[in-house]
Amino acid sequence: MAFAQSGGAGGGGGQRRPFFRRRKTCPFSGPNAPKIDYKDVRLLQRYISERGKIVPSRITAVSAKKQRELSAAIKRSRFLGLLPFVIR
């Protein structure tokens, strides 16, 4: 058969333990979570890269709903001049 795996070299043989990735929780959900506000520059800077881009939610573990709120707050803050568009 063309797709049968052989135990020989290059077969990718050994039994490897699966890597367990812990599920991250959203930092904006919960009882003591901070509110997303366009005036809170210190909070918003944590979700901007060193080049000034918005960090994706798969890295920051922010939920989809809160990521939309966060990006809107960052864009509003940029428009008002509280945050830079580009960091050189």
Swiss-Prot record:
Purpose: Binds as a heterodimer with protein bS6 to the central domain of the 16S rRNA, where it helps stabilize the platform of the 30S subunit.
Entry-linked InterPro entries: Ribosomal_bS18, Ribosomal_bS18_CS, Ribosomal_bS18_sf
GO cellular component: cytosolic small ribosomal subunit
Subunit structure: Part of the 30S ribosomal subunit. Forms a tight heterodimer with protein bS6.
Protein name: Small ribosomal subunit protein bS18
Region span, Disordered: 1-26
Keywords on record: Ribonucleoprotein, Ribosomal protein, RNA-binding, rRNA-binding
Disulfide bonds: none
Gene encoding the protein: rpsR
Gene Ontology MF terms: small ribosomal subunit rRNA binding; structural constituent of ribosome
GO biological processes: translation
PANTHER family, A to Z: 30S RIBOSOMAL PROTEIN S18, SMALL RIBOSOMAL SUBUNIT PROTEIN BS18M
Family statement drawn from the similarity comment of this UniProt entry: Belongs to the bacterial ribosomal protein bS18 family.
Species of the source: Xanthobacter autotrophicus (strain ATCC BAA-1158 / Py2)
Pfam family, one: Ribosomal_S18
